[in-house]
């Protein structure tokens, strides 16, 4: 079974929720990919999409430098779904007009369904439905052959459809949870208009990728960067299933791990798997490279290049022809490393964009198409223990990006001790598995405090706890005050050098989950 035979292509115009669109489609067991809006029409044809979604974006379609996709996509004979900016672009390119709205719409809004065909098939037309609006422009004139499917108080054309072609458009964002009927609309597009089959499954993914890995590797050997996290553990299990003893896993202690983590990872894999595992202590090397470095991008690049250097060194020590390096790059890593205009990354990832041109090993990235929750699902399908599959994410650059500013032994010690307390209290109160991620961040400032009868001027630790489904978006977790209080009290009392603890209540977007 070809799990990629049917695919929904999403053209990205810069929306903060474009990845959510892809994820919602994947949840329906249909494959989806994100590409920049500037994807040439010939390339789009080669992808052979079953359907196309035009994402939202921050621009206005009438601006001189507004991003425009090739209007030829409407001649490909496949269904097209325009969302917010994508809807306005569709209307403009097909003969309608868009102008600045007299009243902008941001946040929750109510729409009334006027036509229950296509997107709104099966929905109750007798009542209004909550959706999420985010726009300052609106459609003024609709093209010939288009008709209104839904309206809101300030958007008479909240949803539109072509009378004879499979083109639909909405002014709101069906991909976000605040649009109560959003999933229904996407499902109607994917299965109703596009006639997709639900062929994107993890069992199918395993079968397809095991065969691909065998063919690519042949008789050569693979070295796998094993960190102990969910991603690298699943990578190791997948490749081991494909080539068995041709795989050697290397765990590198970069000196930036949490207390007892390196020892625990090595013990876990040696006791629970039959992977061939080599452990390398490179603490001094990495800490030396980070000395005096404060820029988070430079930190990530030093760490990424350092890992490659060590893996190449270890590859020379292994019996057999080592030609490949396996690592746990995920789809959000790839998407976030390039903006919708093909430049200006949100942040570089140590797995993406930090690889030197002179690297002598070819890459194998079997998870490159997957979102985080799909990786967990894959791990379960591969038979990995719950402990490996459901642990909270930990960044590849380790604690270096949870220390704002220079990484020093003293500052590492502070954030390590604080982190232990955070995780201990979250587990003790039964909250560890209720949240996506929970950790401590050491800030580059000191504040005045009083301990006993003495004035102090010491470090500040920030707590970061978030709820998420796939790390594409996240909200700060409403952790009960008593848990936060216990964490704060313990950190201030037990971690020397800290006199203040604050709680980060930022969502993603606009913030990222990690501080660097």
Curated annotation (Swiss-Prot):
The active site is at 84 (nucleophile), 173, 175. It catalyses: XMP + L-glutamine + ATP + H2O = GMP + L-glutamate + AMP + diphosphate + 2 H(+). Pfam families: GATase, GMP_synt_C, tRNA_Me_trans. GO terms for molecular function: ATP binding; GMP synthase activity. This is GMP synthase [glutamine-hydrolyzing]. Catalyzes the synthesis of GMP from XMP. Keywords: ATP-binding, Glutamine amidotransferase, GMP biosynthesis, Ligase, Nucleotide-binding, Purine biosynthesis. InterPro entries: Class_I_gatase-like, GATASE, GMP_synth_C, GMP_synth_GATase, GMP_synthase, GMPS_ATP_PPase_dom, Rossmann-like_a/b/a_fold. Residues 200-391 form the GMPS ATP-PPase domain. The lineage of its organism: Bacteria, Pseudomonadati, Thermodesulfobacteriota, Desulfobulbia, Desulfobulbales. Homodimer.
């Amino acid at each position: 079974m070809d799990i990629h035979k049917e695919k929904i292509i999403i053209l990205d115009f810069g929306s903060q929720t474009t990845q959510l669109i892809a994820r919602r489609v994947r949840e329906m067991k249909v494959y989806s990919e994100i590409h920049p809006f500037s994807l040439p029409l010939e390339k789009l044809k080669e992808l052979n999409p079953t359907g196309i979604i035009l994402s939202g974006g921050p621009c206005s379609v009438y601006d001189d430098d507004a991003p425009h996709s090739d209007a030829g996509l409407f001649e490909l004979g496949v269904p097209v779904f325009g969302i917010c900016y994508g809807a306005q672009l569709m209307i403009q390119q097909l003969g309608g007009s868009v102008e600045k709205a007299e009243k902008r719409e941001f946040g929750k809004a109510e729409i009334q369904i006027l036509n229950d065909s296509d997107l709104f098939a099966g929905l109750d037309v007798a009542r209004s439905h909550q959706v999420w609006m985010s726009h300052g422009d609106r459609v003024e004139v609709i093209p010939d052959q288009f008709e209104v499917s839904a309206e809101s108080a300030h958007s008479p054309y909240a949803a539109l459809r072509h009378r004879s072609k499979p083109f639909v458009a909405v002014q709101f964002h069906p991909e976000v949870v605040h649009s109560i009927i959003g999933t229904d609309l996407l499902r109607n597009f994917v299965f109703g208009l596009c006639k997709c089959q639900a062929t994107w499954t993890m069992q199918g993914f395993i079968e397809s990728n095991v065969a691909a890995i065998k063919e690519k590797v042949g008789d050569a050997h693979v070295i796998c960067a094993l960190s102990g996290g969910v991603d690298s553990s699943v990578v190791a299990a997948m490749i081991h299933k494909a080539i068995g003893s041709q795989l050697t896993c290397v765990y590198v202690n970069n000196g930036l791990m949490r207390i007892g983590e390196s020892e625990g990872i090595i013990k876990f894999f040696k006791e629970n798997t039959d992977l061939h595992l080599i452990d390398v202590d490179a603490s001094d090397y990495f800490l030396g490279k980070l000395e005096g470095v404060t820029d988070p991008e430079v930190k990530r690049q030093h760490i990424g290049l350092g890992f490659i250097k060590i893996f190449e060194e270890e590859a020379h020590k292994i019996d057999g022809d080592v030609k490949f390096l396996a690592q746990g790059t995920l789809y959000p890593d790839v998407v976030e490393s390039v903006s919708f205009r093909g430049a200006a990354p949100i942040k570089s990832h140590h797995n993406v964009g930090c690889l030197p041109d002179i690297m002598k090993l070819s890459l194998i990235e079997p998870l490159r198409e997957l979102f985080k929750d799909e990786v967990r699902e894959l791990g379960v399908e591969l038979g990995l223990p719950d402990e490996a599959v459901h642990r909270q994410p930990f960044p590849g650059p380790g604690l270096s990006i949870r220390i704002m500013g220079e990484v020093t032994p003293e500052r590492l010690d502070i954030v390590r001790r604080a982190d232990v307390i955070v995780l201990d209290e979250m587990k003790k109160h039964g909250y560890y598995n209720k949240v996506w991620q929970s950790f401590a961040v050491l800030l580059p400032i000191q504040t005045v405090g009083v301990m006993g009868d003495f004035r102090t001027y010491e470090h500040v630790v920030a707590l970061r706890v978030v709820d998420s489904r796939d790390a594409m978006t996240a909200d700060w977790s409403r952790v009960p005050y008593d848990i936060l209080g216990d964490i704060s009290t313990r950190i201030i009392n037990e971690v020397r050098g800290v006199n203040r603890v604050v709680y980060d209540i930022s969502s993603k977007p606009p913030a990222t989950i990690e501080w660097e």
